[in-house]
């Protein structure tokens, strides 16, 4: 009986131990309940053994492969054996310089800025070299073409534009980059670029000037000992679109040159030049600058034919022409860089301004001499009594400012030669004092003064146009 009870108690303990073991397996932290192995899967014991082997190697977790983060190679990349070579080094490292040929096709010359002294150009830049590491077997000897994704995995020349301000590779609709590899390892690398580069301009003959600008291409890291940069086909390496045109310039010539550039810290580099010559269209500036300035000068000459006593007419005319010339000069300089030398357009505008200003000074001189003359006439009337048979009160009307109607009130008297009323006083005085020697001397002095006053306007009508025409002949013969 005791043996039976002990057996029951042992069975109960075994059952209770099995229950506890099952619960600990299901709820123990960090453990995982494995489903029964499916058909074709590894047995649970075998997977646990692999897990234990990983722990034996000292790693708390399962180790990953060293290149698990790498993107899988495409078939073409496997054919080129991308992973078999170190493409951070140039081809033939340690040997002679690798030749890299370049050709360029200019698509457009977008803008020329005189204020910023730069130009913007869009072009196709193509590089040619040979990298035997990229050679591949081919039964039909056909090349393979890739987009820009392969460029990041192989060696390409590190070209840059010297003196460039801004540049970018076009990316519509995708990156405009092409890579073509031939079976023998020859590579063509082409990209479409827009670059804004500096251009040193000389405006001493502006706007009758001709400018020469250059786009310079150079390797950034490789000296001439590592990379030999050259134009692949000489001058034929540069192609341009026949439809290229600019609003203000005529493109005269495109040509290429090659030079060496020296940097004191790194050495000598091959540099390629794309040179182009621009001649400015003059017709726009003839209409906007030269023609208005010439009209203002000619308009200032109109005052020479206006009566010298018409102050309200001559003074505003002179001031208007001076202010207009100032506006023209300011407008031209606003669209130009602030250079420290005189431009050709400055010479023309400032000489025209001087002519306009001299016409104002000419009237100032005429008006001053007329005022002095009238003052002397007034003094002469005070000294000479009128004996022309006219009533004494009418003598007060013989002032320099009387009108034709007032002259007709002088008893119907008019001079024989039909002179203007401004000479009436002298004629009447001379008629009454004809026999006096003293009056004859005064008459000669007065007539001489009158002739000199009229001569200023008279001679200005000839001297000013003749001098301006002479200036134009000299100016256009020098700068055209």
Swiss-Prot record:
4-aminobutanoate binds at residues 126, 190, 218. Residues 1-21 form the signal peptide. It is found in: Postsynaptic cell membrane; Cell membrane. One of its GO terms (biological process) is modulation of chemical synaptic transmission. Residues 22-281, 336-346, 480 are extracellular. Disulfide bonds join 199-213. It is a multi-pass membrane protein. Inhibited by TPMPA, a rho-specific antagonist, when forming a homopentamer. In contrast with other GABAARs, rho-1 GABAAR is not inhibited by bicuculline when forming a homopentamer. The chain crosses the membrane at residues 282-302, 315-335, 347-367, 459-479. Expressed in the cerebellum. Rho subunit of the pentameric ligand-gated chloride channels responsible for mediating the effects of gamma-aminobutyric acid (GABA), the major inhibitory neurotransmitter in the brain. Rho-containing GABA-gated chloride channels are a subclass of GABA(A) receptors (GABAARs) entirely composed of rho subunits, where GABA molecules bind at the rho intersubunit interfaces. When activated by GABA, rho-GABAARs selectively allow the flow of chloride anions across the cell membrane down their electrochemical gradient. GABAARs subunits share a common topological structure: a peptide sequence made up of a long extracellular N-terminal, four transmembrane domains, intracellular or cytoplasmic domain located between the third and the fourth transmembrane domains. Three rho subunits (rho-1/GBRR1, rho-2/GBRR2 and rho-3/GBRR3) coassemble either to form functional homopentamers or heteropentamers. Rho-1/GBRR1 subunits can also associate with alpha-1/GBRA1 subunits to form a functional GABAAR. Interacts with SQSTM1. This is Gamma-aminobutyric acid receptor subunit rho-1. It comes from Mus musculus (Mouse). The gene is Gabrr1.
């Amino acid at each position: 009986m005791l043996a039976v009870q002990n057996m029951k108690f042992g069975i109960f303990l075994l059952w209770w131990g099995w229950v506890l073991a099952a619960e600990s397996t299901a709820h123990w932290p960090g453990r995982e309940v494995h489903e029964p192995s499916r058909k074709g899967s590894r047995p649970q014991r075998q997977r646990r053994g692999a897990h234990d082997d990983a722990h034996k190697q000292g790693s708390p977790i399962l180790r990953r492969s060293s290149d698990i983060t790498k993107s899988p190679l495409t078939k073409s990349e496997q054919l080129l054996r991308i992973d078999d070579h170190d493409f951070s080094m140039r081809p033939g490292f340690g040997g002679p310089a690798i030749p890299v040929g370049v050709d360029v096709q200019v698509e457009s010359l977008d803008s020329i800025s005189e204020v910023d002294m730069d130009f913007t150009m869009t072009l196709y830049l193509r590089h040619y070299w040979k990298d035997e590491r990229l050679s591949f077997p081919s039964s039909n000897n056909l090349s393979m073409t890739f987009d820009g994704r392969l460029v990041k995995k192989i060696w390409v020349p590190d070209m840059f534009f010297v003196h460039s301000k801004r540049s970018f590779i076009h990316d519509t609709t995708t990156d405009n980059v092409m890579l073509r590899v031939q079976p023998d390892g020859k590579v063509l690398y082409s990209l479409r670029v827009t670059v804004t580069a500096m251009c040193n301009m000389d405006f001493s003959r502006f706007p009758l000037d001709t400018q020469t600008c250059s786009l310079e291409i150079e390797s950034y890291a490789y000296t001439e000992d590592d990379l030999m940069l050259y134009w692949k086909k000489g001058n034929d390496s540069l192609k341009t679109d026949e439809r290229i045109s600019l609003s203000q310039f005529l493109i005269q010539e495109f040509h290429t040159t090659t030079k060496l550039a020296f940097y004191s810290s790194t050495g000598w580099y091959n540099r390629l030049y794309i040179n182009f010559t621009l001649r400015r269209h003059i017709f726009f500036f003839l209409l906007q600058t030269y023609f208005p300035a010439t009209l203002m000068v000619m308009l200032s000459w109109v005052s020479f034919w206006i009566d010298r006593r018409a102050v309200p007419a001559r003074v505003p005319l002179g001031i208007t022409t001076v202010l207009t010339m100032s506006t023209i000069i300011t407008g031209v300089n606003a669209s130009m860089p602030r250079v420290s030398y005189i431009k050709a357009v400055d010479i023309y505008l400032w000489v025209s301004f001087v002519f306009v200003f001299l016409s104002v000074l000419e009237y100032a001189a005429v008006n001053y001499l007329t005022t002095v003359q009238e003052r002397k006439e007034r003094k002469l009337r005070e000294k000479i009594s009128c004996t022309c048979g006219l009533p004494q009160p009418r003598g007060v009307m013989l002032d320099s400012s009387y009108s034709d109607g007032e002259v007709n009130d002088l008893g119907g008297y008019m001079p024989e030669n039909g002179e203007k009323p401004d000479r009436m006083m002298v004629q009447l005085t001379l008629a009454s004092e004809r026999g006096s020697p003293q009056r004859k001397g005064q008459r000669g002095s007065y007539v001489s003064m009158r002739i000199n006053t009229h001569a200023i306007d008279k001679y200005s009508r000839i001297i000013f146009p003749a001098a301006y025409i002479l200036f134009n002949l000299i100016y256009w013969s020098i700068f055209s």
